[in-house]
Amino acid sequence: MKVLLIKDVKALGKAGEIKEVKDGYGQNFLIAKGFAKAATNEVLRKYESDKKKEAENLRFEIANLEKLKEELSKITLEISKPVGANGSLFGGVTKDEIAHALKEQSHIEIDKKSLECDTLKSLGIHEVSVKLGHAIHAKFNISIKAE
């Protein structure tokens, strides 16, 4: 009997593979436990269709992330912070403040956990990197000025 594996099965194969197994093993274990489906023409067509839709969605998502990366590369955020008598910042600029400023100034919402920087503790222009997903990283500038 031929089965289409839905989940990875140790010593048999990975999800998406078509395997030839004995009838009892296929019916009583793999199909009964939800590890596989009988590899009928209908099941295989549906699997291929779902696979194509998933690939198309992935391409669409990557295209959107590339567009966002392009938008972010053109941005320079302006953040004003109080400074001491010697010109140093009080506390610095945190990831939370950067994410909030990005949302306020550019209307782009980024999770602060995806920002790849430490607390910025000096005035001037700093480059910040952000993980967008699917191995796509974007960089943008932050200008920290005295209040």
Swiss-Prot record:
Stored SUPFAM superfamilies: L9 N-domain-like, Ribosomal protein L9 C-domain
Which InterPro entries does the record associate with it? Ribosomal_bL9 (IPR000244), Ribosomal_bL9/RNase_H1_N (IPR009027), Ribosomal_bL9_bac/chp (IPR020594), Ribosomal_bL9_C (IPR020069), Ribosomal_bL9_C_sf (IPR036791), Ribosomal_bL9_N (IPR020070), Ribosomal_bL9_N_sf (IPR036935)
Q: Which GO terms describe its biological process?
A: translation
Annotated GO molecular function terms are: rRNA binding; structural constituent of ribosome
Pull one GO CC term from this UniProt entry.
ribosome
Keywords for this entry? Ribonucleoprotein, Ribosomal protein, RNA-binding, rRNA-binding
Q: Mind telling me which Pfam families this protein's record contains?
A: Ribosomal_L9_C (PF03948), Ribosomal_L9_N (PF01281)
Source organism, top-level taxon? Bacteria
Function according to Swiss-Prot or TrEMBL: Binds to the 23S rRNA.
Q: Which family does it belong to?
A: Belongs to the bacterial ribosomal protein bL9 family.
PANTHER family found in the cross-reference section? 50S RIBOSOMAL PROTEIN L9 (PTHR21368)
Any idea what this protein is called? Large ribosomal subunit protein bL9
Organism this protein belongs to: Campylobacter jejuni subsp. doylei (strain ATCC BAA-1458 / RM4099 / 269.97)
Q: Which gene encodes it?
A: rplI
